Curated annotation (Swiss-Prot):
Domain J: 7-73
Protein name as catalogued: Chaperone protein DnaJ
Binding site for Zn(2+) 2: C174, C177, C200, C203
Cell location: Cytoplasm
Ranges annotated as CR-type zinc finger: 144-226
Assigned protein family: Belongs to the DnaJ family.
UniProt keyword annotation of Kinase present: no
Gene Ontology biological-process entries: chaperone cofactor-dependent protein refolding; DNA replication; protein refolding; response to heat
Record-linked SUPFAM superfamilies: Chaperone J-domain, DnaJ/Hsp40 cysteine-rich domain, HSP40/DnaJ peptide-binding domain
Role, per record: Participates actively in the response to hyperosmotic and heat shock by preventing the aggregation of stress-denatured proteins and by disaggregating proteins, also in an autonomous, DnaK-independent fashion. Unfolded proteins bind initially to DnaJ; upon interaction with the DnaJ-bound protein, DnaK hydrolyzes its bound ATP, resulting in the formation of a stable complex. GrpE releases ADP from DnaK; ATP binding to DnaK triggers the release of the substrate protein, thus completing the reaction cycle.
Subunit structure: Homodimer.
Length: 370
């Protein structure tokens, strides 16, 4: 069958020694000039001319295809299966050669993502989540608190409504793929020609492109804004806990929903207390005479203020007193306890008078001392 020879240089109106930049400029000018939407009265002729321009650019923009065209006058398909004179099995050579040509596995092309679906750029996608860290005081966990924050996020472009298209301009068929959403690739090897299809990188597989990109967002459909928001911190959150604010993240793509704002809460350490779940531990040191005779001490509370704790006579070192409901809020709002750990200080040095009083007391009680 005789091949139809076409002068691709003549179709694009460029000389045979034209640079890639000259070819690209000619192509862009011609696809705009001959787009079928611009010739409703001669649409059929325009479509044919448009396809020829597309075909010419497809060949001349590819160095390998252009070299073959310059040499043979056409770019066509040859039988793929030829006798291999290399070591190893025939199919191993085929697979190896295929990978060298396309830079990907043969199964990825024929059975993977490239063959099974069309990856569209302009489908609605959810926006990204944004992560933000807030620090709170221990006292903020008693009744909860509200903290104002300020952060940057992408919002839906108010000019184009997220479409990325300049208002009133609309869409046109993709000039690169001719509206099909697919690009056909031919690669030559010593086995012959391999032909594959891939998603058009110009339109993302949709077959159409904006006639004019939005002047405000540049076609992304999103604009960066600084926003303010008040975050409500619940009373029972743990250190390192997370809060999810639905819709507080970045705007979606092409009408997709907003992502979420994820807050990580860090509780500042309080030197007065140690945490044990919902309980708080407070250490206090009293004099040995207070432990013997009893006393009343002032205990700070995590929410602020103080309470009085009565230490009974004869309190032993490391005695723990439990103040119920004075800890941190737990499930259903029930608070943990405040545990007061009493340390007793024994003096290392005594005055002569103090020592005599204690020696007399020991003698009366029959306690041997040094």
């Amino acid at each position: 069958m005789k091949r139809e020879k076409k002068d691709y240089y003549e179709i694009l109106g460029v000389p045979r020694n034209a640079t890639q930049e000259e070819i690209r400029k000619a192509y862009k000018r011609l696809v705009k000039e001959w787009h079928p939407d611009r010739h409703p009265e001669n649409r059929k002729e325009a479509e044919q001319r448009f396809k020829e321009i597309q075909e010419a650019y497809e060949v001349l923009s590819d160095p390998q295809k252009r070299a073959m065209y310059d040499r043979f006058g056409y770019v066509g398909e040859q039988p793929v299966y030829q006798e291999a004179e290399t070591g190893g099995s025939f199919f191993e050579d085929v697979f190896r050669e295929f990978e060298n040509i396309f830079n990907r596995d043969i199964f990825d092309v024929f059975f993977g993502e490239e063959s099974g679906r069309r990856e569209r750029r302009e489908y609605a996608r959810r926006g990204e989540d944004i992560r933000y860290t807030i620090e709170v005081n221990l006292s903020d966990l008693i009744n909860g608190t509200e903290i104002p924050i300020e952060y940057e996020r992408y919002e839906t472009c108010p000019r184009c409504g997220g479409t990325g298209v300049e208002p009133d301009s609309g869409y046109i068929s993709c000039p690169r793929c001719g509206g099909t959403g697919r690009i056909r690739e031919e690669k030559r090897s010593f086995f012959g020609y391999f032909v594959s299809e891939r998603t058009c990188d110009e339109c993302g597989g949709t077959g159409r492109v904006p006639q004019e990109l939005c002047h405000e967002c540049g076609g992304s459909g999103r604009v960066l804004r600084r926003v303010r928001r008040t975050i409500k911190i619940p009373p029972n959150i743990e250190d390192g806990g997370h809060l999810r604010i639905p819709g507080g993240g970045n705007a979606g793509y092409y009408g997709g929903p907003y992502g979420d704002l994820i807050i990580t809460v860090r509780v500042r350490s309080d030197s007065r207390f140690k945490r044990s779940g919902k309980d708080l531990i407070y250490d206090i040191t009293i004099d040995y005479l207070q432990a013997i005779l009893g006393t009343t001490v002032e205990i700070p509370l995590p929410e602020g203020g103080t309470t009085m704790l009565k230490i009974p006579p004869g309190t032993q070192p490391e005695t723990v007193f439990r103040l119920k409901g004075k800890g941190l809020p737990g499930e259903y709002g029930r608070r943990g306890d405040l545990l007061v750990n009493v340390h007793v200080e024994i003096p290392k040095n005594l005055s002569r008078e103090e020592r005599k009083v204690l020696e007399d007391l020991a003698k009366k009680r029959g306690i041997p001392v040094a």
